[in-house]
């Protein structure tokens, strides 16, 4: 039972971490201000 709980928590935290990482990684592309700071085209 303990192994099942550990495995479930591991999978849940893994998917949550991947989701948060993907959201933070794609966030600068959605906000024009930070995108302009990263790659100024003017």
Swiss-Prot record:
Belongs to the PsbI family. One of its GO terms (biological process) is photosynthesis. It comes from Prochlorococcus marinus (strain SARG / CCMP1375 / SS120). HAMAP family: PSII_PsbI. One of the components of the core complex of photosystem II (PSII), required for its stability and/or assembly. PSII is a light-driven water:plastoquinone oxidoreductase that uses light energy to abstract electrons from H(2)O, generating O(2) and a proton gradient subsequently used for ATP formation. It consists of a core antenna complex that captures photons, and an electron transfer chain that converts photonic excitation into a charge separation. This is Photosystem II reaction center protein I. Keywords: Membrane, Photosynthesis, Photosystem II, Reaction center, Thylakoid, Transmembrane, Transmembrane helix. It is a single-pass membrane protein. InterPro entries: PSII_PsbI, PSII_PsbI_sf.
